């Protein structure tokens, strides 16, 4: 009944044109608003997917960190046990801390992340270089890969046409006795090799280099690390993987 009553006004003659026009305009506005809402939601969903993609580029599937403090001990037998797990595609050992990068007069604080040669296999960072190459070098001749924001802050040059910057990496030392503040910091040089551009949170704060260089500068023990980053095989149930890893590592 109500539908028939309303339809009369949509089909009205000239004497009721005002109602007819208002009805069609209202219908058009509602339709337009609905389309806009769908468009906004679609754009938002796409943006959410982009953000997740950017974060997954930098972060591994699983990251193991100590319950307390900044480091934990991981003996060779536990490393082998992790490597032998069926769901582990690969993993990288990490030595990480806050540092200061100095390039001549320019200085900038960063989070320095020492990684091993497996890092290329578990991270998307090497595929996000805007210039240079992904080369972490060795303990004695380390390479440095920095975020785009860090590059600008410290005026770091990686262009092969010019001499790449040699950057001083200033790090805290562990296990130092005495009250001399200078004895508690270390300085080492790393050659700038590449620049990554992912997202401001990472680009403005992170620098990657050789894990053995970082451990050497910070006086880490041979089996001491800050984290383990693990890439899981496709189809792995994350909760089950974490449970098995917990059984190996215990309460480190």
Located regions from the model:
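Hydrophobic alpha-helical segments of integral membrane proteins
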Residues: 2-6, 10, 51, 55, ...
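Charged, alpha-helix-enriched surfaces in structured cytosolic catalytic cores
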Residues: 1, 19, 42, 46, ...
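Conserved, well-folded catalytic cores of nucleic-acid-processing
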Residues: 9-13, 128, 248-251
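Short acidic/glycine-enriched loop/turn elements at secondary-structure junctions
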Residues: 89, 98-191, 216-218
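N-terminal Sec/SRP start-transfer signal
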Residues: 1-35
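Mechanotransmission and gating elements of multispan inner-membrane complexes involved in transport
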Residues: 172-252
């Amino acid at each position: 009944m109500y539908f028939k009553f309303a339809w009369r006004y949509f089909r009205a003659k000239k004497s009721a044109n005002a109602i007819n026009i208002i009805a069609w305009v209202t219908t058009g506005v509602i339709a337009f608003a609905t389309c806009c809402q769908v468009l906004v939601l679609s754009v938002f969903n796409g943006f959410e997917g982009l953000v997740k993609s950017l974060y997954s580029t930098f972060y591994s599937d699983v990251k193991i960190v100590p319950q307390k403090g900044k480091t934990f001990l991981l003996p060779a037998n536990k490393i082998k046990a992790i490597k032998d797990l069926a769901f582990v595609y690969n993993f990288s050992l990490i030595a990480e801390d806050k540092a200061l990068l100095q390039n001549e007069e320019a200085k900038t604080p960063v989070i320095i992340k020492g990684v091993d040669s497996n890092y290329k296999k578990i991270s998307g960072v090497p595929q996000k270089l805007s210039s240079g190459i992904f080369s972490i070098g060795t303990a004695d001749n380390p390479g440095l890969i920095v975020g785009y924001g860090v590059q600008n802050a410290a005026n770091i040059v990686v262009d092969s046409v010019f001499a790449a910057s040699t950057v001083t990496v200033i790090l805290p030392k562990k296990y130092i006795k005495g009250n001399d503040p200078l004895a508690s910091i270390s300085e080492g040089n790393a050659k700038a090799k590449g620049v990554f551009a992912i997202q401001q949170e990472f680009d403005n704060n992170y620098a990657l280099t050789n894990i053995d260089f970082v451990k050497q500068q910070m006086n880490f023990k041979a089996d001491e690390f800050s984290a383990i980053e693990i890439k899981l095989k496709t189809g792995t149930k994350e909760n089950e993987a974490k449970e098995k890893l917990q059984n190996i590592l215990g309460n480190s």
